[in-house]
Amino acid sequence: MAILGIEGFNRLTERQRMHLLYEVCSSPIWARRVLAGGPFRDADALFDRAERVLAELPDSALDAALDGHPRIGARADNASSAQEQARVASADDSVKAELAEKNRAYEERFGYVYLVCASGRTAEELLAILTDRLGNDPDTERRVMRSELGKINRLRLDRLLSKETA
């Protein structure tokens, strides 16, 4: 077994790289634009490209990226989300219920799923962040959400480059 690394990523076919990038962020526009910046000299070049593309992504493409993220506390439908939200699964039922209630309030207020880099955070921490962010105005929240998506993408890209290959 070997680690994929940036060299291995660059050697993959365009289709394979596109598929992997889409697993990181479910915006086809983001994945295509990141891919267009390759081959990458090192992991930092990939991370920088991913961050720049996200910053320039139109809101419609950003909304498409959110479709790949389950609600915090809901059953994750992909391995990345499940791993990132692992500490929520063991939370007290009352905390999970409050998360569900505030998730719905967030979606009603802002029109999209509450997105936060959940990796390593407890359900209680995520609930406190959600409660705080419900007080944001829509423009501020959009910026915060975009920043959180960037953190998630970076975490997933790092994990992608570190995964073992056959």
Q: Where are the regions a protein language model picked out?
A:
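Long, amphipathic alpha-helical surface segments
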Residues: 126-166
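GST superfamily/GST-like fold recognition
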Residues: 121-122
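Conserved phosphate/anionic-ligand binding catalytic regions in large, soluble enzymes, centered on
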Residues: 118
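Conserved catalytic/binding loops enriched for acidic/polar residues
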Residues: 114
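Aromatic-anchored, charged helix-turn/loop surface patch used as a conserved interaction hotspot
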Residues: 1-106, 151-166
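Substrate/cofactor-recognition hotspot
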Residues: 109
